[in-house]
Amino acid sequence: MTKKIDSRLLPLAHERVPRPDIYLDGKPALVLDKRTIRRTERDAFTDNLAAAEFMRDLAKTIFGPRRMIKLVLSKDGKYPLTFVTSDLQSVLKRIKIKHPAALLLAGAAIATHREKGDGCVSTILLATNILHACKKVFRKKTHANVIIDGLSLAYQKIMDLAPKLAVPDKYDAQRVIEIGVRNSLEGKLVSYDLDCVSKLLSDAIRLVGIENLTGPDGAEIVDVKKTSGGSLAESLVVDGIVLTQEIPNEEMPRRVEDAKIALIQGELRLPGKKIHRYQDYRFEFDHPERFSGFNQRNRAFLESLVAKIVEVDANVILVQEGVDDFLFDYFAKRGVLVIRRFPPVEFGRVSRALGAKMIPDPSLLVPEDLGSAKLVEERKVGKDTFVFITGCKAPKTVDIVLRGVNNWALDDVERVMKGAIKEAMTVAKDPRLVWGGGAFEQELAMQLDEYSEGIPDRRQLVVRAVAEAFESMPAMLAETVGLEAMDVTAKLRHRHSRGEVSAGVDVNNNSIGLMSSLGVMDSLDVKLQVIKSAFEAAITILRVDDVVIAGELPDPERHYLERIKGTSREKLKEKDALLE
């Protein structure tokens, strides 16, 4: 007897039955989607290493003070975006990286920059150099876990050696911070801009003081505002706060001395139409007199709302959200300056600088909640108008007003400055320095190589590979100024073997020099973070022994599988029973 086939399981005209891996209950089943790519063990390592080497090639030309620049064309929303930068973090955030290993390296680099303000390029280069050096050990049929154990051993030894290579403490704290700022800016700006920005940041840090820079709110102490027009040399350092908000009423004062400032957290108006996503309201009037009466009551309500503000004699009011138009005239007649609409982070920053308390309900305001400033004044800088608040009650904030030819140039300078501010905070917290120019990495490589001789198993090869990876860092730095990597490595080995621990690459004179004579130093804390991030990324990639890249079925096969999903015999019987 011929078994009857359920026609619902047959493909339609636009469908096709995929070739199955196995059959379950008479239906085709796929263990992996068609077009899935799978690479295991050595093939997986080779694939990940190729992605890592691509990232190394992307980063090595923007390594060091003599770095090149990248021209990036991307699409931001509907509009194409073109910008020029030598900041690798900006490039990584704009380009779309798809390979998982490359994404991991990019994430490690961005995390280092976000944490310490620098080290983005060094993280990628060191991680990829470690992987490249381990490739030789891997090809000798060394198990991945043995390589990982060797990397862990090398990392522990580096963490023990690195603090011993710190430069003797002979600089004051301010000078150490200036060195850190200068190093962060090197190569990211042209020489003239470098001097201007370095001076701006040094002046700003001197104003806020090192104690405030290392405090819990250190990241918000120095902020950057921008205005196009003029040159970078015309930029300002303001001992106080600069607001980009405009004064909303022409009759309000443009200059207030001995300001008493109230901060209202919320809005000074009737609540907006939408209370929340499930509740809304609107007003309807069936007679003009009712509308007139409503306006009168609305004004009476608003006057009662701000009565306490007038009572405490505040002459400047900062409101986080909106203000009713009626109140603009109300305050203007009383000579009170109102500024509205602040981002939450900036509002908190203003509160700390003024020594004012943020009040959610104006009726709760008391004189002790007010902040104070010697002067609140509107000024025009370039094409834009700003409100300057100086002589604050708690002077813990400094704003830098950047001026430049266009917004593209200003955006790049702003990114670089914020990274330099972060590095200044890092150096202020940990002022230890090491010799720059690749001298630190070369000395670590020499000591690691010596340490590896005492390891009796295959981990010795891994530690030597790590030493080779560190030794390649000054070689890469030398390549950026046109020197031969092998010649530089040989000369550095010779000089470090004679005890010249500060011998490194002099990028200004294209030669080998003593960094102690040139005064070239880097932050030890940044170096340690780079090493930590690079080792974590390299070990994570080495742990990968299977790469499965999911593919997609062709449309006819995908349509067929979507339609018959859930069409087991039991479910078909249930559907038939419902139809009966």
Which positions does each model-derived feature cover?
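P-loop NTPase nucleotide-binding/switch module
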Residues: 23-38, 103, 499-516
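Short, flexible active-site-proximal loops enriched in glycine and acidic residues
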Residues: 115-125, 144-147, 163-174
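Extended amphipathic alpha-helical scaffolds
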Residues: 2-91, 155-404, 412, 568-580
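Extended, low-charge hydrophobic alpha-helical regions
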Residues: 46, 96-98, 399-401, 406-580
